Regions:
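Nucleic-acid substrate recognition interfaces
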Residues: 1-225
Length: 225
């Protein structure tokens, strides 16, 4: 059986443009949501998810063989390609969810509140390896992220919490981690890494097994039984 574990590494306080990067990424997602809701009927006719994504990207990104219909490249110049595609994917998911909820609402004769399309979002960027994320020197509590400084996208060295890095080196050394996702909790920023591993399930009869369940309450602490 394959399981996925994740761990957040805190970014130490320093003068790096994390907030600016997050703001421009979320602005890009909001802008794309506004575009895709306008052309959703056209996009919805494409059943294949990959082809739909490609069509959505062609609408906003100009290449030698394609002229974009919208001015995304002008509004968000030099945005790294992987980050742009991440924003497109998030926007498509948001509009698709909204349209699905709207269809269900219409089928129920509008008995409940009409769904609203929310442009403000809490999307968090993924720092894809090599193009947006590079590991620091072996044994160093640091990494390199491509961040937006208000004018351009540049590589910045970020210091990582020593205790968190020691845990990763001790428990996950040699295992491949996914591209880290930026996370914000209690006014602090983290890079969340995910790890895949294979585990062998026990052959003990179900009635003889000890089961641990965790109830993650919305307004209460977790309850374990």
């Amino acid at each position: 059986m394959q399981i996925i574990s994740s761990y957040g590494v805190e970014l130490r306080k320093q003068n790096i443009p994390i907030r600016q990067t997050l703001e421009i990424y979320r602005s890009a997602v909001s802008y794309l949501i506004g575009i895709y809701v306008q052309v959703w009927e056209e996009l919805a006719e494409i059943p294949d998810a990959k082809r739909r994504f490609n069509a959505a990207e062609h609408l906003v990104h100009t290449t030698k063989k394609n002229h974009a219909c919208f001015d995304f490249d002008i509004r968000f110049p030099k945005m790294p390609s992987y980050l742009r595609r991440s924003a497109i994917q998030h926007a498509l998911g948001t509009v698709s969810s909204y349209k699905t909820r709207l269809d269900l609402w219409e089928k129920t004769d509008g008995k409940s509140g009409k769904p609203k399309l929310v442009y403000e979002n809490h999307a968090m960027p993924v720092f894809y390896r090599d193009v947006m994320y590079r590991e620091g020197a072996e044994g160093k509590d640091e990494a390199y992220l491509k961040l937006y400084d208000g004018h351009d996208w540049k590589w910045s060295c970020v210091r990582l919490d020593h205790t968190d890095m020691e845990y990763l080196r001790k428990c996950w050394s040699g295992k491949k981690a996914s591209a880290p996702t930026l996370e914000k909790r209690h006014r602090k920023y983290f890079l969340r890494f995910s790890y895949k591993e294979e585990v062998t399930l026990t052959k003990t009869p179900v009635k003889e097994q000890i089961i641990c369940s965790v109830d993650l309450g919305i307004n209460t602490d977790a309850v374990c039984t």
